[in-house]
UniProtKB/Swiss-Prot annotation:
Taxonomic lineage: Bacteria, Bacillati, Actinomycetota, Actinomycetes, Mycobacteriales
InterPro entries tied to this protein: DUF5302 (IPR035172)
Organism: Mycobacterium tuberculosis (strain ATCC 25618 / H37Rv)
A Pfam family annotated for this UniProt entry: DUF5302
Region Disordered: start-end pairs: 1-62
Superkingdom per UniProt: Bacteria
Polar residues: compositionally biased ranges: 1-13
Protein name: Uncharacterized protein Rv1155A
Biased composition (Basic and acidic residues): 14-28
Amino acid sequence: MGESKSPQESSSEGETKRKFREALDRKMAQSSSGSDHKDGGGKQSRAHGPVASRREFRRKSG
């Protein structure tokens, strides 16, 4: 349980962690530099066409 690591193992582990941290920092910097897809707005300006010209279906009564 009380396994002690040699100095070389701990330094190589620290080196690996440092490399991964640097790679993650580069990745985060690259992804945050671009704009989000939500910022551009949609192609369609409104949800549907004019409401007045929409067809209305009514159930026949009587």
